[in-house]
């Protein structure tokens, strides 16, 4: 029996696996999927009993027509190999195909229900398309008939500025590139060097469900739903339906139809504008003619201008005739009024008025003589003296009355206070905390006693409680303290 080292037996196993199987196809359900930072894709293919580890290297990930997704039933093609350092075998996959359209349709239906539950298909989310966009952004492959059809149709209908964002329209790179293109157009600023489009078109020609699968990826649907720019989806033919069709603002059956939705026909628009202009001119001409005829009808109903001025001219003539007499009468009335107002200003009247004012001033001056002031001061002094005497008498009476009330209250306090009771032979007992003791049991429990008599206080120590004895008969003349 030959003897092998670990490295030797691992190498033999690797050579046996690779030589015996070579390139193989394996059918199973995709399990765990993980893409490393390096770009390599690691996943499992499993059935109800076993699991096969698979790897797709970074350079081959982009060429996959279907990206492995957990739960998807696929057929993978690759080469079986072994890793001696880990004692594991692995399938290096370079091609992934869906095991059947039924699996893809089930996955598509699952995604549709999820996105619909989130409200991404709601009609109220869909925005109207701009009537005549200035700039149209097209997301598609830069080669092929799709972009040529769109540009040709736009040029025929109404030439617009078009920005093309080239993307892969199938394969593993399709979904991330389309999502990045939608997000990228939305990041353009309206006034930037590269202006922001007013409308987006995501377009691709027809193909199998596997070819169109990139437009069924969740990342594409969410990017289209989040777009702030109105978006038309034109993926596949009229019978092809993808997830992006449900979240876009409008769905076009073909890329050519998307271009027709985007812009009106320029010639039709010019013809319509010309027709509307002609209608407006005819309407304006008719309106002017109607107004002119109406003006002529109204002018015939008006009187002649000369007849309108006859009556005012007669009133003016009569007023001119009365004007000189009216001026003379006005001057006479003003003269009479002036004479009436100037009568009190005669010299005799002025002298009488001045004399009366002098007599009044003399009377006032006599009241300000020194003797009159002395008499007034003396009278006010006597009045002040009388008021001072009355105030002193009232204060003395008030003070005496309050003193008597205070003495009476003090006598009542002494009568009702416990000091008077102490003077009759009673005492107040407190503990060392100053609390009042009213029973023998309280006094027995106290650590120290403080006894207050009428003439002072005595401090004494406490004593244990003694058995209760028959109380002595109180003297009949001694009353209760409380």
From Swiss-Prot:
Gene Ontology, cellular component aspect: cytoplasm; exodeoxyribonuclease VII complex
GO molecular function ontology, one term from the record: nucleic acid binding
Region described as Disordered: spans on this chain: 457-482
Localization terms from the record: Cytoplasm
Record keyword RNA-binding present: no
Documented EC number(s): 3.1.11.6
CDD domains assigned: ExoVII_LU_OBF (cd04489)
Catalytic reaction annotation: Exonucleolytic cleavage in either 5'- to 3'- or 3'- to 5'-direction to yield nucleoside 5'-phosphates
Enzyme class: hydrolase
GO biological process: DNA catabolic process
InterPro entries hit by this protein: Exonuc_VII_L, Exonuc_VII_lsu_C, OB-fold_nuc-bd_dom
Pfam families on file: Exonuc_VII_L (PF02601), tRNA_anti_2 (PF13742)
Family: Belongs to the XseA family.
Record's function text: Bidirectionally degrades single-stranded DNA into large acid-insoluble oligonucleotides, which are then degraded further into small acid-soluble oligonucleotides.
Subunit structure: Heterooligomer composed of large and small subunits.
Protein name: Exodeoxyribonuclease 7 large subunit
Classification of source organism: Bacteria, Pseudomonadati, Pseudomonadota, Alphaproteobacteria, Rhodobacterales
């Amino acid at each position: 029996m030959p003897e092998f080292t670990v490295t030797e037996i691992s190498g033999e196993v690797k050579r046996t696996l690779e030589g015996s199987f070579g390139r193989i196809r394996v059918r199973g359900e995709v399990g765990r999927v993980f893409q490393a930072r390096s770009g390599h894709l690691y996943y499992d293919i499993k059935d109800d009993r076993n699991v096969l580890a698979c790897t797709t290297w970074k350079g081959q990930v982009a060429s996959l027509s279907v990206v492995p997704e957990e739960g998807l039933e696929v057929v993978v093609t690759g080469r079986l190999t072994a890793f001696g350092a880990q004692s594991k075998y692995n399938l290096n996959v370079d091609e992934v195909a869906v095991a059947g359209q039924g699996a893809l349709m089930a996955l598509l239906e699952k995604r549709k229900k999820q996105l619909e539950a989130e409200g991404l298909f709601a009609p109220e989310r869909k925005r109207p398309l701009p009537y005549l966009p200035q700039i149209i952004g097209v997301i598609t492959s830069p080669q092929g008939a799709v972009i040529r059809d769109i540009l040709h149709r736009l040029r025929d209908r109404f030439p617009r500025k078009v920005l093309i964002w080239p993307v892969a329209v199938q394969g593993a790179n399709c979904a991330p590139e389309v999502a990045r293109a939608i997000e990228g157009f939305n990041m353009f600023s309206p006034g930037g060097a590269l202006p922001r489009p007013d409308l987006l078109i995501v377009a691709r020609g027809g193909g199998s469900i596997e070819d169109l699968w990139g437009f069924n990826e969740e990342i594409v649907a969410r990017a289209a739903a989040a777009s702030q720019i109105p978006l038309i989806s034109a993926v596949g033919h009229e019978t092809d339906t993808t997830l992006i069709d449900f979240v876009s603002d409008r769905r076009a059956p073909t890329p050519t139809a998307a271009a027709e939705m985007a812009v009106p026909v320029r010639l039709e628009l010019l013809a319509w504008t010309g027709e509307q202009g002609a209608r407006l001119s005819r309407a304006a001409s008719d309106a002017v003619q109607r107004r002119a005829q109406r003006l002529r009808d109204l002018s015939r109903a008006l009187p002649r201008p000369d007849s309108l001025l006859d009556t005012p001219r007669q009133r003016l003539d009569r007023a001119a005739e009365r004007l000189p007499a009216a001026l003379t009468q006005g001057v006479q009335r003003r003269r009479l009024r002036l004479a009436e107002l100037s009568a009190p200003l005669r010299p005799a009247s002025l002298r009488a008025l001045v004399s009366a004012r002098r007599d009044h001033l003399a009377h006032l001056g006599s009241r300000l003589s020194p003797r009159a002031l002395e008499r007034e001061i003396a009278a006010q002094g006597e009045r002040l003296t009388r008021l001072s005497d009355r105030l002193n008498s009232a204060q003395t009476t008030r003070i005496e009355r309050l003193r008597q009330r205070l003495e009476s209250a003090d006598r009542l306090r002494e009568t009702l206070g416990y000091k008077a009771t102490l003077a009759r032979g009673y005492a107040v007992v407190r503990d060392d905390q100053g609390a009042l003791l009213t029973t023998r049991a309280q006094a027995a429990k106290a650590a120290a006693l403080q006894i207050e008599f009428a003439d002072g206080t005595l401090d004494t120590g406490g004593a244990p409680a003694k058995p209760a004895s028959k109380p002595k008969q109180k003297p009949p003349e001694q009353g209760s303290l409380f």
